[in-house]
Amino acid sequence: NNEWGKAEESLEKALKLSNRHPQVLNYLGYSWLKYNMNTDKAAAMILEAYEKDPNDGVIMDSLGWVYFKTGDYDNAILYLEKASELNPQNAIISDHLGDAYWFGGRKNEAVFQWKQALSQKEEQEELNAKQVKNKIENGLKNIKKLSIQDEKIKKNLHSLNDITE
């Protein structure tokens, strides 16, 4: 939509002005993923943000979301669980973790996370509560998976150190 176009333009300017600040990289990359746009650039930006600030829960959520959107549910769960540990009151992270659990075959845990998301204060205004309630009632259907074309980005995603070590 037109509002997103203006926001995207502002974020790209902020990225240059901020010397590729991890929060700006993450926000623009995540926004592109959210709108199913520029998948390779989005993943590269989120990876760069993660390399610059690997202990930021919101950035870790975005990295988990890259894995989720590309169908790698095991790694999505790994990073989203860590993001949830770092930001235990974040409704969006709980919602994302619920989605990953659902497609990872962990249905009860998914429903628990979605219910958690509805009661959490942080990022509540960003949460689509009606959509989350629908997921609690009906689960999730198949989603459109995004694919990363750039081999270097794929390699970087697959070579990240296991965060559980």
Which sequence ranges carry the predicted segments?
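Structural signature of tandem alpha-helical TPR/SEL1-like repeats
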Residues: 1-13, 35-48, 70-82, 105-116
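Amphipathic alpha-helical repeat scaffolds of TPR domains
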Residues: 22-31
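Terminal, low-structured helical/coil segments at or just beyond the last alpha-helical repeat
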Residues: 37, 108-165
